[in-house]
Amino acid sequence: MEHFDVAIIGLGPAGSALARKLAGKMQVIALDKKHQHGTEGFSKPCGGLLAPDAQRSFIRDGLTLPVDVIANPQIFSVKTVDVAASLTRNYQRSYININRHAFDLWMKSLIPASVEVYHDSLCRKIWREDDKWHVIFRADGWEQHITARYLVGADGANSMVRRYLYPDHQIRKYVAIQQWFAEKHPVPFYSCIFDNAITDCYSWSISKDGYFIFGGAYPMKDGQTRFTTLKEKMSAFQFQFGKAVKSEKCTVLFPSRWQDFVCGKDNAFLIGEAAGFISASSLEGISYALDSAEILRSVLLKQPEKINAAYWHATRKLRLKLFGKIVKSRCLTAPALRKWIMRSGMAHIPQLKD
């Protein structure tokens, strides 16, 4: 049975960044359910916008995005729609429009060969025994069993590692539903849509490489019905759909209290969305995935005596920032306050008309 210093479950932005940063410094194995290349297999449903905080992370690491990761067009504002109040406002934003699946595969491609990576793999079981973490996974057509000193859960909203460490932990979840359509709008745009009759979260749209993507986060019970109802409402705001080319859905976490952020215990750690590190006001998670990976890298390499406590302490600033997003979310989803902000015209950039 092979033994490693670190076993990473999941190679989204958080897991890929950590594996790359630990390469050559610790013996690392990493498991991921995505394929190494191509569009077959799992791909994460996501609007695919790289926020300024994520961009700063790449600046610190000296990385530049390859052209095949960047999508067209690049949009500099978000059209914010309050459906009930029939209000639309434009706010400046500095996102980079990306192809999320290509981005994830590019992040994986940066992991050095010294890391043992298993693509298209499935983690079947984890447990702790004799001060080691045991991992059973299936890859390349057969089942394997390894041990590791440290276990890292970078496995997203439905994290197996989080469920094992915190079996009684409850965090609010939504079903994120997206559909892709052939682009029909004469001017591409990115939008953020609020309708409290549909969801107490929000919905979105983005123009990307000739497609119009429309999606949102909805209650788990009847999300599909609510999604369809909202699509019908959006015709009043000149949204054009047609026949869906592709439909996607996944679970997304929605932290709503301080206790929703969990970092791990017993030499196991959580990073990215698995830890609850996702913005409640925008559902943006890439920047927090990259930041938490960098924090954990630093902690693992320093090897403090109480290593889980050190990671918890080191993420305090990140958790405070995310708690601020919870407060912001409550403001944005409060109909009266949102209506007042939008009617005030604060930060709104009106579009010139011919």
Curated annotation (Swiss-Prot):
InterPro entries hit by this protein: FAD-bd, FAD/NAD-bd_sf, Geranylgeranyl_reductase
Organism name: Escherichia coli O157:H7
Family, per entry: Belongs to the CbrA family.
One GO molecular-function entry: FAD binding
UniProt-recorded name of the protein: Protein CbrA
SUPFAM superfamilies membership: FAD/NAD(P)-binding domain
